[in-house]
Amino acid sequence: LVTKYHVISNLVDPKYKGYSRLYVKLPSDMETKIPAKVIGYDSTLDLALLKVEITPDFVFELGSSKDLVVGDKVSAIGTPIGLEGTLTAGIISAVSREITNVGHVFQIDAAVNSGNSGGPLIDENRRVQAIVFAGMLQFQGLNFAIPVEYLKQILPLLYQGGEITHSWTGTYGHTYKVKNQKKGVEIQYV
């Protein structure tokens, strides 16, 4: 089970290898609390992998969010302000916003709140295209999601367990492209 790290961060104890206070509830049985274990997490990318001892009725397939364009229909699943099992719909408003240390994220107009954070953003074919994170409180309706490609890159490391750390070289940059061909790195600031 993948979620946002900030959703479970106050429950993470790197020294504790067993189950903790962390649990999940299924939409079909909101009364039962199922113990969960944090396998791995990355506080920089704000992602966490949990292990839950259940066999789910349905597992979403990971999509390829690099194929999404502005105007594509998407839906966000979550529990906004505690309202369990909520599905909101919208479109991709922008495909390449640089608002976090993650890099390029999607801007979406689907209604999301803090309870949606960590939930999937799915396309019309029920494939996960991104992981939702709550928008900016002071700008209502401005919401974002991390493309599933980031998850695909980090998932093997999360499975290895523990905390994933990133080095910092003192510079910030992005991939330099010419006619959609990667040509190197463009340094934006030092």
Per-region residue spans from a language model:
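Active-site loop architecture of trypsin-fold serine endopeptidases
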Residues: 5-17, 57-59, 77-90, 96-118, ...
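Short histidine-centered loop motifs in beta-beta connectors
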Residues: 59-67, 114-115, 188-190
